[in-house]
Amino acid sequence: MSSTDNIVSGKAQHSYWRKSDTTWTLGLFGTAIGAGVLFFPIRAGFGGLIPILVMLVLAYPIAFYCHRALARLCLSGANPSGNITETVEEHFGKTGGVVITFLYFFAICPLLWIYGVTITNTFMTFWENQLHLPALNRGFVALFLLLLMAVIIWFGRDLMVKVMSFLVWPFIASLVLISLSLIPYWNSAVIDQVDLSALSLTGHDGILVTVWLGISIMVFSFNFSPIVSSFVVFKREEYEKKFGRDFTERKCSKIISRASILMVAVVMFFAFSCLFALSPQNMAEAKAQNIPVLSYLANHFSSMSGSQSSFALTLEYAASIIALVAIFKSFFGHYLGTLEGLNRLIIKFAYKGDKSKISMSKLNTLSMVFIMGSTWLVAYVNPNILDLIEAMGAPIIASLLCLLPMYAIHKVPSLAKYRGRIDNVFVTAIGLLTISNIVYKVF
């Protein structure tokens, strides 16, 4: 083959795009769009127009560079079929495998607690404000909803996997539709409140603190890290043998980039549309009421009384129902991951890695009791959801998504070629800023 043919062949490889690449682009995108998105407009809009514009600039770099770093770590293992746990064990030994198992479990379990609080508050808000029924006991509502989900999960897991997978796209479509439908209700309140002479960079309500806290909710909302390991394994098995690891890395990066663009476009449009239809004060009220933005929108349009349009009347009921479905979808998906993670920890520490010492049904029952029991307790206590995200959920995700890959890049020889890059500094900074929220929340 001539040098010209080699160049043409190389260009063909770089532009090579399969149907499976599109499928994974949409899969990563769909994984990230869940119940967490319903809280992003509240935190992003809480500080007004300037902070959310800064977040708009940061959104794509956070989504792309952080997930690409994790994908590169997954790609660094010798075994193309090895998942992230095997890869970390290869680089850092059995201790590294234990650490990654703990990180995965504690990155997902707090999300269940968050969703337990959210689904309880959303249901109670719908019950009282849309159905106009007497208030119910919080402990009873939380217990009923969790038992209902436990029964559905226990007896219809396979069916629910299919149903939840199907619901991803209607949920995304509903977010886009709501964003578009809110346009006639946009107002200039958020713009009118911008006073450049009164802007403060520092202080409790300053731009820097607002953006700093906003980074946590962005890490939480723009997150498809649970599926990155499976995604990389699939692409390595598909491309690496024929085209090599470098090509596979570029292919994974391109897919992650396109998924990030889709994700940022949908979520930021939804956030801006909510903010322009409401106001920063409304977002502060939503935070205080501890409900997702769709529930607040439903209550907001409900208060319009006789002046409601047909859309406002529809949204009053549809928004809460969409929120409930979204939360259940996210709860179910994260429950499976939490169950698997807790099962691995129990087998590893209680039975020294011997699966034969306990039946899977007994193990699943023990894990379910702990997961549902702890989720009910948190839902009953009703901590502020955004505070819980910023103090627990996002920092643990950041340690897995940002700091672990950066540590590996500086320690693992096969990742040495990625050292000294400016995007490494950015990813490390995002990870540290997110984790430092714990200190801010405590003090």
Curated annotation (Swiss-Prot):
Recorded topology in the membrane: Multi-pass membrane protein
Transmembrane segments: 22-42, 44-64, 97-117, 135-155, 163-183, 207-227, 259-279, 319-339, 366-386, 389-409, 422-442
Gene Ontology cellular component annotations, sorted alphabetically: plasma membrane
Keyword Transit peptide appears in the UniProt entry: no
Keyword Repressor listed: no
Lineage: Bacteria, Pseudomonadati, Pseudomonadota, Gammaproteobacteria, Enterobacterales
Reaction(s) this enzyme catalyzes, per UniProt: L-threonine(in) + H(+)(in) = L-threonine(out) + H(+)(out); L-serine(in) + H(+)(in) = L-serine(out) + H(+)(out)
Described purpose of this protein according to its UniProt entry: Involved in the import of threonine and serine into the cell, with the concomitant import of a proton (symport system).
Subcellular location(s) per record: Cell inner membrane
HAMAP family: Thr_Ser_transp_TdcC
PANTHER family (alphabetical): SERINE TRANSPORTER, THREONINE_SERINE TRANSPORTER TDCC
A Pfam family per the record: Trp_Tyr_perm
MF terms in GO: L-serine transmembrane transporter activity; symporter activity; threonine efflux transmembrane transporter activity
Keywords: Amino-acid transport, Cell inner membrane, Cell membrane, Membrane, Symport, Transmembrane, Transmembrane helix, Transport
Similarity section: Belongs to the amino acid/polyamine transporter 2 family. SdaC/TdcC subfamily.
Listed NCBIfam families: PRK13629.1 (NF010152), stp (TIGR00814)
Protein name: Threonine/serine transporter TdcC
